[in-house]
């Protein structure tokens, strides 16, 4: 991932593995595919070389539907077509030669995309649902040690820690990790 502006965790992934070559790295992803999405889109694509290319990023594969151009026949994934991500995050839909879509010249793709701009600082800070005990965002920091056996030594929220509320939440979490440890916070510089 090289879209550091929209997918801020990619900054940490890149720095950890490509610049400093250290591990492990534990990430808390707050981009929720049930909550942070754009409205459904339908577009028609020309079949070229037995495939179509959906030149959009952030497509949720479980919500990708392929139909004939008129939208009257919906084709089956892995039977009539195979969809896969490319290295740049777009999607290629290959038509199965023995599938029902084999003679189509154009296909209609309907899909839902992630919307990173819908993430808020409240999502990053997170919460605890008292009814279900489900934790989100920075509230998950205390789960890292018991679940994985690693003590989070550096806490950061790339693209978010310049927000005062996020900075305070990071400081609070770093001061007592699993009631046993402390960590340090790496803050963004607001430019």
Which residues are covered by each model-predicted region?
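Surface-exposed assembly/interface segments
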Residues: 1-191
